[in-house]
């Protein structure tokens, strides 16, 4: 069986970082992922996909990614259920992200620098002999 998801989309809001009672980091976020076709009005529509990421990756995503940023994630689809306050069974389907990659720099108005800004600039690569 294969359960593998790869998504590229924009964060609809800042990542919500929480900790379980045993202090395991868990971050929830929603990605807006454009569809590959346009509707009757010529506009591209988007799907809004709920995602969750755990542990150190959750803390890193929360620290580095902000609303509107383009990110890529890999993970799997998972369904869970719980009983709400009214005693009804609620089913939730979401993507459990295993890794992420930020695909663009943060807005220049942010007070903190991005990882890309802290990388040294080595200049162009020399011509290789092969």
Curated annotation (Swiss-Prot):
One of its GO terms (biological process) is DNA replication. Keywords: DNA-binding. GO terms for molecular function: single-stranded DNA binding. Signal peptide: none annotated. Residues 108-130 are annotated as: Disordered. It comes from the Bacteria. The keyword DNA-binding applies. One of its GO terms (cellular component) is nucleoid. It holds the Pfam family SSB. The keyword DNA-binding applies. Residues 1-104 form the SSB domain. CDD domains: SSB_OBF. InterPro entries: NA-bd_OB-fold, Primosome_PriB/ssb, ssDNA-bd. Homotetramer. PANTHER family: SINGLE-STRANDED DNA-BINDING PROTEIN (PTHR10302:SF27). This is Single-stranded DNA-binding protein 1.
């Amino acid at each position: 069986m294969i359960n593998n998801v790869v998504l590229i989309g924009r964060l609809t809001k800042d990542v919500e970082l929480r900790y379980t009672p045993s202090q395991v980091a868990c971050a929830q976020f929603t990605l807006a992922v454009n569809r590959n076709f346009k509707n009757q009005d010529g506009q591209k529509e988007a799907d809004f996909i709920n995602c969750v990421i755990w542990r150190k990756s959750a803390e890193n995503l929360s620290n580095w990614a902000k609303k509107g940023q383009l990110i890529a994630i890999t993970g799997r689809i998972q369904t869970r259920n719980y009983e709400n306050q009214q005693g009804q069974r609620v089913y939730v389907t979401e993507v459990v992200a295993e890794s992420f990659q930020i695909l663009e720099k943060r807005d220049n108005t942010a007070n903190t620098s991005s990882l890309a800004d802290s990388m040294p600039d080595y200049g162009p690569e020399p011509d290789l002999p092969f």
